């Protein structure tokens, strides 16, 4: 994490120099200019502050974008903390004002129930990605291409679907829509965590075994593993979604500059995958240096986020 201390610079203009022949009006003008300079500098110093960004456990784009904005905001005078929690805890925390910002709200499907519950207590800042999708993925050489064919191929996959966190929207969609629609009630649906799912995926591919996993795009796994999405002819996984940044109520008023930057933020899949891949395998204690190196390699784009 980044723990730089925000430094405020206040400029004090001294108007004590009296020149021979200067009128009192000149003196007053000098004092007024000094007051204006001090006031402007104080306003600049107040742009920073303490912020808490909430990160969804196991959601790689949540981690990547939060680490990115932690670095950007701290470079611009803020002191930033990251707090990790499951979605239900995060939405409650943002509504209660315990967290300032969450960058990974999927709409209109995945997190719709949370917006229904907390939407009038939080602020929408804007979407930064508009082609996100929930997916069911398999190894690229798997004997099926569609969810409609999966039930008949149970022996090929051991009758198992490997999922992520129990409280995830993707998990609920898989359990409530995908499984009953495609006749997969007899399959074992395993939920634990995203890292556990990715570990099973890695192991299966290394061993040349078939595997079914719940996944989503954007995700670095699509660049790292030879996998394909199963077609969803019944549309159980929904249409493409947007990834939206939300903040606690009053955030835009309290931190107008940060709110403007976050509202204007967009990031394409190529940049996101690259940052996520750089973070994969890194210890949390190394995140600062990993993100700093990535920012240096993409400095022009990063600078544009606060231009």
Provide a role label for each language-model segment.
Residues 1-9:
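Bacterial N-terminal signal peptides that target proteins for export
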Residues 6-7, 19-42:
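Bacterial lipoprotein signal-peptidase II cleavage site
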Residues 46-61, 78-83, 158-162, 262:
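Short, well-ordered beta-strand elements
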Residues 57-60, 82-93, 188-200:
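Short helix-initiation/N-cap motifs at beta->coil->alpha
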Residues 60-79, 179:
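Short, polar/charged alpha-helical segment
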Residues 99-103, 166-169, 173-235:
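Ligand-binding pocket segment of bilobal, Venus flytrap-like solute-binding proteins
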Residues 119-167:
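A conserved helix-loop-strand patch within extracytoplasmic ligand-binding domains
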Residues 133-143, 241-256:
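A bilobed periplasmic-binding-protein/Venus flytrap-type ligand-binding module shared by bacterial periplasmic
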């Amino acid at each position: 994490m980044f723990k730089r201390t925000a430094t405020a610079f206040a400029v004090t203009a001294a108007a004590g120099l009296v020149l021979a022949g200067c009128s009192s009006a000149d003196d007053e003008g000098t004092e007024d200019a000094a007051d204006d300079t001090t006031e402007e500098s104080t306003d600049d110093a107040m742009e920073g502050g303490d912020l808490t960004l909430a990160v969804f456990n196991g959601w790689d784009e949540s981690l990547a974008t939060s680490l990115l904005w932690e670095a950007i905001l701290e470079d611009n005078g803020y002191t930033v903390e990251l707090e990790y929690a499951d979605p239900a805890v995060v939405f409650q925390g943002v509504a209660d004002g315990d967290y300032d910002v969450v960058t990974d709200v999927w709409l209109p499907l995945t997190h719709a129930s949370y917006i229904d519950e907390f939407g009038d207590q939080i602020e929408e800042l804007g979407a930064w990605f508009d082609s996100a999708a929930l997916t069911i993925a398999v190894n690229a050489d798997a004997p099926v291409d569609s969810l409609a064919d999966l039930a008949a191929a149970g022996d090929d996959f051991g009758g198992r679907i490997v999922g992520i966190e129990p409280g995830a929207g993707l998990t609920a969609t898989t359990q409530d829509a995908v499984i009953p629609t495609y006749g997969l009630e007899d399959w074992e649906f395993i939920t634990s965590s995203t890292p556990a799912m990715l570990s099973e995926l890695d192991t299966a591919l290394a061993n040349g075994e078939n595997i079914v996993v719940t996944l989503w795009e954007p995700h670095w796994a699509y660049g790292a593993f030879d996998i394909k999405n199963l077609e969803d002819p019944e549309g159980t996984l929904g249409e493409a979604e947007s990834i939206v940044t939300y903040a606690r109520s009053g955030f835009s008023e309290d931190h107008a500059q940060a709110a403007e930057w976050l509202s204007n933020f967009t990031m394409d899949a190529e940049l996101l995958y690259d940052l996520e891949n750089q973070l994969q395998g890194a210890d949390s204690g190394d995140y600062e240096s990993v993100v700093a190196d990535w920012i240096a390699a993409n400095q022009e784009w990063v600078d544009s986020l606060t231009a």
